[in-house]
């Protein structure tokens, strides 16, 4: 328990500041996206100030090994890095989805992120330590990169990895009525 905080659960007055919510933290340099934490608990100090117990998400470039080609632009890692943040400092809301949920979004906004890995910051370890790979390049899935399924083998490929382009694949699929 944080030494300055009494264990008096507070009322959670708004959607933006409730248990389980994530919010953009704009402390990193402006060139980097926000580094959102997830609220786990809100407590009231003896002074009446409210504090949030949060766990931080890490961007790939902050983790051991750095950003890889398969990490998407909006990818974050859950972590075991906990901290306390003043509730009054929270000024926004964002959503951190599991990868499958993110793939199902009809529209991805600036406040949508996704996660598929947990990162133990103190040890520099990831879970899971292996993920499925796709395409001739044998890379894990990156939702930012266009892929097409081969009807013959039902495998997924990046057009450029099989000597094609997104435009050529789109025109081919359009001519056969397979693309909206």
Predicted region positions:
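Short beta-strand-centered aromatic/proline hotspots
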Residues: 21, 31-45, 52-55
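Residues immediately within or flanking Cys/His clusters that coordinate Zn2+
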Residues: 36, 51, 131-134, 147, ...
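Helix-boundary capping/turn motifs
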Residues: 17, 28-32, 151-152, 158
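A short beta-strand-loop micro-motif that forms or neighbors metal/cofactor-
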Residues: 167-180
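Short Cys/His-rich metal-coordination motifs, predominantly Zn2+-binding knuckles/fingers
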Residues: 137-142, 153, 161, 176-179
């Amino acid at each position: 328990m944080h030494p300055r905080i009494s264990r008096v659960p507070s009322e959670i007055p708004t959607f933006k500041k409730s248990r389980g919510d994530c919010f953009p933290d704009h402390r990193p340099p402006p060139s980097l996206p926000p580094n959102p934490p997830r609220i786990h608990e809100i407590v009231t100090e003896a002074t009446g100030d409210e504090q949030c117990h949060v766990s931080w998400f890490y961007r790939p470039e902050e983790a051991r090994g750095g950003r890889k080609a398969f990490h998407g632009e909006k990818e974050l890692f859950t972590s075991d890095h906990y901290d306390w943040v003043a509730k009054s400092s929270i000024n926004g809301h964002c959503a951190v989805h599991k990868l499958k949920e993110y793939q199902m979004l009809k529209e991805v906004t600036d406040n949508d992120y996704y996660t598929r890995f947990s990162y133990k910051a103190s040890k520099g370890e990831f879970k899971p330590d292996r993920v499925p790979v796709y395409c001739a390049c044998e890379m894990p899935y990156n939702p930012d990169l266009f892929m097409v399924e081969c009807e013959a083998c039902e495998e997924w490929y990046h057009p450029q990895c099989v000597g094609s382009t997104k435009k050529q694949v789109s025109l081919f699929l359009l001519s056969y009525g397979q693309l909206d």
